[in-house]
């Protein structure tokens, strides 16, 4: 076993190694998946007069990932969800911050229905008050980080993972630029917020086009194979993050217990 190659290979890139058993993402016993239709296993059915949209949570990438890791995943998501709607009631409705649903890690995959709306203000980290989320601006950035802050309010030690938008799919003209801004915002938030990591599917994931795109999409949403692939990518990305930042995750087992303040000694 080559420990250096497994944990400290500087040439390894995220998703170079695709895991099917969750890998080191399995160090988390609970995940909260905050998102929209693509976090909800939504299938789209073609029909004349308007397509049908149906959330099949058992097919969501979160539930595929839970089955891989042997962990518990909570779907705090719904088709069409935005950061604004989440804060205006859905977060409470779905029980995101209920004591019995508090998670060790939260994976936030929101933004498609927010930033692709013409005229939507994406905002910047300057829109965020780290001391009082009630002062956050009414931009996507302000609302998105408020969701993060409320997660940290109920679980101060939770690890947060922010997902960028893959390339391809059904983006229309001009929307790729918005998705690029969203990608940069995720990095800016992670740097500002702390204990937060970016799952950059836009940079390291595949482009959803051609034969591949047609194979994993069903109309405008992913099919079962597409959601399974997404679960493998997100689990593999978290596996990569944990392996390359072992010190950051030494006390994961204490998250949500009375031992959260125990200091981890250094080895000589």
Q: How should each PLM-predicted stretch be described?
A:
Residues 58-60, 86-100, 145-150, 184:
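Alpha-helical scaffolding within the catalytic cores
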Residues 30-34, 39, 72-77, 104-109, ...:
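Structural recognition of the beta-strand scaffold that forms the well-ordered cores
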Residues 2-77, 95-97, 247:
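Serine-esterase "nucleophile elbow" of acetyl-processing enzymes
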Residues 165-268:
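Catalytic His-Asp segment of secreted/periplasmic serine-dependent ester chemistry enzymes
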Residues 64-72, 146-161, 185-199, 241:
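A structural motif corresponding to the C-terminal end of an alpha-helix
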Residues 85-138, 168:
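Oxyanion-hole/transition-state-stabilizing segment in secreted/luminal serine hydrolases
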Residues 37-40, 78-84, 112-117, 166-170, ...:
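Solvent-exposed loop/turn segments at secondary-structure junctions
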Residues 40-56, 79-85, 124-134, 219:
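Acidic/histidine-rich helix-loop elements
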